[in-house]
Structures are given as C-alpha cells and as structure tokens.
C-alpha cells in the first residue's frame, strides 16, 4: 500500500534520456480502480509522455493495470488520461512543447497529503548520445573521487 507522499510509479529513465528544464506537479483524472491499482504500487510510466489533445493536456501510453478484486470493473490500461492544471500553466507548457520543441515527460506518480493522485511532469529536451556518455563519465568520476576520499581519510 502506498502512503501519502510516497511514489506509486516512477520513470527512472527520464533523467538519463532528457535534460529536465523545469518540473511541474499536476493532478490526473483516474477512475476508482486505477487509483486502487496505483495504491498497491502497480503502474508503469516508463514509455509515457504528455501532450496536447483538443486544447487540453493528456498523459499518453501510461500503463495502469486493472485492479484485481472479486468485482471486476475493467478499464482500458493505456487510455489517455487528462492532466489537471491551471490555464496559465497549461498555456505555458503547450507553447514550450509546440514552439521550442520540448517534451513533457512524466517523472513520477505519487499521492499528496490528502490522498489525491498527482503526477510530476518534467519539461525536457532530449539528450544526444555524446551528452549521455559525458554524464556517465562525470558520474563515474564523482564515484571514484568519493571512493578515494573515503579510503584516504
């Protein structure tokens, strides 16, 4: 069971694949069995992305499996889910997506203090292969540096 403030689903590849320029927290419209499934810790947003549809922002390709119970209430597992944002925030994000060629990547789905499902979105720009290699080299160097300092001191 996922407690308030804890992460229900996380996109661990997002920070490796993209430069995260800014982060935004949004509400997400879910049906009851989707919420129950997320509370159990099921759900996958590794292949998900957010984008405009009919003047609104939606989360596409997020996988939330059906909740297993005695009374099945089936829902579509990869349906587009509406994101709940203020109009100003939505306009800012839509202009960044269309004009600047950026992407909205879901970073995690968590439950707020009142038990409401929230999604953390990152406004991101894609990394090239050499950027990924540079990040790996820097991470390895920091790890080696910490190891040297620990062994020496």
Swiss-Prot record:
Gene3D superfamilies: 2.40.280.10. Signal peptide: none annotated. InterPro entries: SmpB (IPR023620), SsrA-bd_prot (IPR000037), SsrA-bd_prot_CS (IPR020081). One of its GO terms (biological process) is trans-translation. One of its GO terms (cellular component) is cytosol. The keyword NAD does not apply. Its main location: cytoplasm. CDD domains: SmpB (cd09294). It is found in: Cytoplasm. GO terms for molecular function: RNA binding. Transmembrane segments: none annotated. Belongs to the SmpB family. Required for rescue of stalled ribosomes mediated by trans-translation. Binds to transfer-messenger RNA (tmRNA), required for stable association of tmRNA with ribosomes. tmRNA and SmpB together mimic tRNA shape, replacing the anticodon stem-loop with SmpB. tmRNA is encoded by the ssrA gene; the 2 termini fold to resemble tRNA(Ala) and it encodes a 'tag peptide', a short internal open reading frame. During trans-translation Ala-aminoacylated tmRNA acts like a tRNA, entering the A-site of stalled ribosomes, displacing the stalled mRNA. This is SsrA-binding protein. The lineage of its organism: Bacteria, Pseudomonadati, Pseudomonadota, Alphaproteobacteria, Rhodospirillales.
